[in-house]
UniProtKB/Swiss-Prot annotation:
Origin species: Yersinia enterocolitica serotype O:8 / biotype 1B (strain NCTC 13174 / 8081)
Sorted UniProt keywords: Chaperone, Cytoplasm, Plasmid
Keyword Cell cycle: no
Statement: the UniProt record of this protein carries the keyword Chaperone: yes
Protein name, per record: Chaperone protein YscY
Amino acid sequence: MNITLTKRQQEFLLLNGWLQLQCGHAERACILLDALLMLNPEHLAGRRCRLVALLNNNQGERAEKEAQWLISHDPLQAGNWLCLSRAQQLNGDLDKARHAYQHYLELKDHNESL
């Protein structure tokens, strides 16, 4: 069975996920955003929101994979590198976290100078 969502339904899931996150319910946000991304894996805003929810829920391994996916699709987005750094910190990989954070700072400085 093939399930598809209209653009409006996708935005509804995204906004509800974001609202759950803002209300401090990161786990609920992940459930809604997982549903959105199961049906539309390329939804960038959904992936970014899920990444923040995963970090808030201390799910470092999933967050690291999500951040790496986002970086592979948008390597110049500084926030992706900051989230990768935080995920690696949660996973106890401090050397990688420092490297990712350094990359974040370089991109941030570069973007501010434009």
